[in-house]
Structures are given as structure tokens and as C-alpha cells.
Swiss-Prot record:
Quaternary structure (record): Monomer.
Species of the source: Methanothermobacter thermautotrophicus (strain ATCC 29096 / DSM 1053 / JCM 10044 / NBRC 100330 / Delta H)
Signal peptide stretch: none
PANTHER family noted in UniProt: PELOTA (PTHR10853), PROTEIN PELOTA HOMOLOG (PTHR10853:SF0)
Domain remark from Swiss-Prot or TrEMBL: The N-terminal domain has the RNA-binding Sm fold. It harbors the endoribonuclease activity.
Protein name stated in the entry: Protein pelota homolog
Amino acid sequence: MRIVEEDEKNGVIELVPETLDDLWHLSHIIEEGDLLSARTTRRIQDTSGEKIRSDRGVKKTFYLGIRVETVSFHIYTGRLRATGVIERGPEDLVPMGSHHTLEVKLNTPLRIQKEHWSRWTLKRLRMAVRASKNLKAIILVMEDDVAELGLIRQYGVEYRGPITGHIPGKRIQQRDRGKLRREFYESIVESLQKYGDLETIIIAGPGFYKSDFYDYLMERYPEIAKKAVLENTGTGGRAGISEVLRKGTVERVSSEKRIASEIRNVNEFLEKLARDPDSVVYGKVEVMDAINMGAVEKLLVLDRVVSREDIEGYLDMVESMGGSVVLISSEHEGGKQLESLGGLAGILRFKIQ
């Protein structure tokens, strides 16, 4: 996520979503009553009555602002849509007061105007912006004995390499080929270890080397292997990196990792609930009472609860007392389990019963 402009006086923020996670965050930042503006495309028909044959109209792109009524995000298609009444736009093209659905698209500017930006909503927005500034992933493309690295950053791809193994043909003894291949793999590992805080490594390529290197990581560097996923490409080098980007693999894997982390947090709560019920609380009243006592070490909050319930002060209270707040999406099984518990659950630092 990138903020383009911020007009605090008028409650306007213009931003550019860059990942599927950004769209997910925006699905809970954009609320009913917001004025949402973006470029949109509509088919405009000739209403002059002069045409005899049916007129399918002409597609035109223009800036449109709607007063939001509903917001929907479909996690599997990655589509974020907001529906509402048109308040701003070219009056010769669209009737004011009619309904329209805006689709929020990646890498396309979007303006959100609110009567009041809550502290927690702004904090969530800043978190998304900070996350996008970090190194998102490394794409490692391997073809034969040549490897190329693509560091995926907010502004684009930063290339590193090539790393060359100089592994000769099969006429050389297998023992020597194995030694040279290990040296090649070690040089790649050395490059990867420079980015220790990285969460995602996509190992790609057209041939056998990518899976062989992954097996090598599993055996010798399991801490790196657990961050890695495999992807097929038709070619190596920078063209292979571009192919991975076109497939949307980085966005898909990043989203899957966020979901996996959320599910782990819900499972941690459920395990404690089964093993020692007094070490956790759930339900709105019980959780808020525990927060007031300073007993909540980790608070799990369903995304729908954040947008619908007046709990911002309680979220701030947990963090001010050294606890953590974890937002859980309602789009996966972990979120549905949390929803069945009332949408709020806390892991306690001390028992209150």
C-alpha cells in the first residue's frame, strides 16, 4: 500500500493498493457512508434517439465518486467491490443519485473520504503501508547451472546475479559433478542468507535444478526450506522472474502465509481452551472485562467485529498494557471458528477466576 496524498482537514486519503493483502485491509477500512472515488469504465449509450439499430454504447473511462453502501471482498478471486450512490462524476455521462459498483484494482489510485478516521483504522492503514515497504519476496530462477535472483520490493524488482555453477557435462565423473553442484548450491544459500528476515522464497525454473536445490535445502537448511515454494516457468533468467510475476505467485503466496499465521493463532487459542479453560476468555462481555483487568496478553479480533463494534478503545488498551492485537479474517476456517465464539477471544497473562 502506498499513500499518495493525505488531507487531514477534509478527511481524505488517496492511496494505491499493491497486493491482495492491501485489498483485504481496504475491505475493512472502507465503510458504509464513506465517499469513495476512483477511475471506472462504463458503457455509455446514445440516448438521442437518432440511431435506428440497437446501440451497445461506447466504453468510456472517467473519475467517479460514490457514497458507499456495501463492500465485498472475494478472497479467492481477489476482487474488492464497493456499491453505492453516485455523488461525483461527469453529469453528461452518469446520472447523479443512481447506483454504481466500483471495483478497486491493484496499482490504481483510490480516494477515501470519511467524516472521521478512527485511530485504529489509521493504524491499520499505516501497518499495511509499512508492510509494503519491506522486502516482500525473493524469486530464485534456476536453469541448468545458472541462478538469477529477483528481490521484490515496493518499487519493483531488484536483480541480483547471475550466480554460475560452472558444472561440466556428464563426461566428468559423477563424484566431481556432485561436488561442483554442492558448491553451486552453497553459493546460492550464501546469497539467500543475506536476507534473513525474508518470509517468502519462490524457487522457479524450467528444469530439474529447482526441485533438486529445494531437496538440498530441506536436508541442510530446513529453516530456509520452510520459507520456500516451487513454481514452474518456461525459461530461466530475468525472463523467468517476469513469468513468475505475471502469474501472481508472489501475491498468492503472501496471502496464504498471512492466512496460515491467522489460523495458527486461532488454533493456539483453541488448544489452550481445551487444555486449560481458565487461561483464555471469549465473548464480548468476558473479553472486555478481562481487558479492563489488564489480563489479556493476546487479543484475537474478527475483522467484521473491528468494523461493526465500538471496541477501538479496548484494542488500544490491550496494546498500551504490552499485549498484542491480532486481526483474523472471516474468509477462512479459523475466522469462522472465531466467529462462532463471538468474534473476540483473549489469551490471558494471568487467570482471573
